[in-house]
Curated annotation (Swiss-Prot):
Protein name per UniProt: Pantothenate kinase
Gene Ontology biological process: coenzyme A biosynthetic process
Family membership: Belongs to the prokaryotic pantothenate kinase family.
Name of the gene this protein is made from: coaA
Record's keyword terms, sorted: ATP-binding, Coenzyme A biosynthesis, Cytoplasm, Kinase, Nucleotide-binding, Transferase
Length: 306
């Protein structure tokens, strides 16, 4: 990390863990395992060392947002409707965004006991495979142009103005938008938005998704580690698809284990790595906080915007 992070405070794991008064984490091992992604690694110690201090920090930002909103209402001499505190979570494919997002949802719900906490992913705003195919963009799935960004920005504007909204649902099992299915997002107190593209907007250079965020997190790691995690996840998904002909990953079983992993390695190199280096990683300095991972998904450093 070079001059890109001149505006960040670098904090070691050891220092970070002491920024929160030691207490019992509000979940047990079974609950933690139930929210953990396929090949992610996270422990109760990680919750105590990393995520409880993070929740304390989010409390500070939440209080600041409430104070600012109240002061604005006085200045403008009008009531401002309740708006959700929006948290963006970004990072590469297979870096552990889903685990972090689900853990944040659980911890926030148990810290702010009278608050509602919703979680959504930007996958639902991918164009359906049929649309991508008609535009010869299937091999660009996950790249900025494969998302309906205008629809996503409209959704954020609706939510930020205190109104409920309906969003499409994406399934990793069928690798496509689920037809005739949607998720209703009411007006929560907290909304966590997870996606590789949450700091990007290729269609409107004047407006970024991050303009709607009250707090944002980027999960960072060396690309060699992420490649290994991606291949581990692919192998696990293959195994889970063995008895399910409808599962998207079932089709790769005919390649054999080595052939399937060679295919996954090519997908990583030709698509996911290119997307990471060209579009995802360059946006990380837009985050308020960067969680840096090393081997085995261990968070060793935290970068907090000054």
């Amino acid at each position: 990390m070079a001059n890109e992070f001149i505006n960040f405070e670098k904090i070691s794991r050891k220092t970070w863990q002491h920024l929160h008064q030691e207490s019992q984490p509000p979940l047990n091992e079974n609950e933690l395992n139930s929210i953990k992604s396929l090949n992610d690694r996270i422990s109760i110690k990680d919750v105590t060392d990393i995520y409880l201090p993070l929740i304390s920090l989010i409390q500070i930002y939440k209080k600041s947002q409430e104070n600012l909103s109240f002061s604005k209402s006085i200045f403008l001499q009008k009531n401002i409707s309740n708006r959700p505190f929006i948290i963006g979570v970004s990072g590469s494919v297979a870096v552990g965004k889903s685990t972090t997002s689900r853990l944040l949802q659980l911890l926030l719900a148990r810290t702010f006991k009278d608050s509602s906490v919703e979680l959504m992913t930007t996958d639902g705003f991918l164009y359906p495979n049929a649309v991508l195919s008609s535009r010869h963009m299937l091999n660009k799935k996950g790249f900025p142009e494969s998302y309906d960004m205008e629809r996503l920005l409209d959704f954020l504007d609706t939510i930020k103005n205190g109104q409920s909204a309906e969003i499409p649902v994406y399934s990793h099992e069928i690798y496509d938008i689920v037809p005739n299915k949607s998720q209703i997002i009411e007006v929560p107190d907290f909304l966590i938005i997870e996606g590789i593209n949450v700091f990007q907007n290729p269609q409107n250079n004047r407006l970024y998704m991050s303009d709607f965020f009250d707090f944002s997190i980027y999960i960072d790691a060396d690309s060699d580690y992420i490649e290994n995690w991606y291949l581990e996840r692919f192998a696990t998904l293959l195994d889970l698809a063995k008895n399910d002909k409808q599962n998207y990953y079932n089709r790769f079983l005919k390649l054999g284990e080595k052939g399937a992993l060679d295919f996954a390695r090519d997908i990583w190199k030709d698509i996911n790595l290119v997307n990471l280096e060209k579009y995802i990683e360059p946006t990380r300095s837009r985050a308020e906080l960067i969680l840096h991972k090393t081997k085995n998904h261990k968070i060793d450093e935290i970068y907090l915007k000054k």
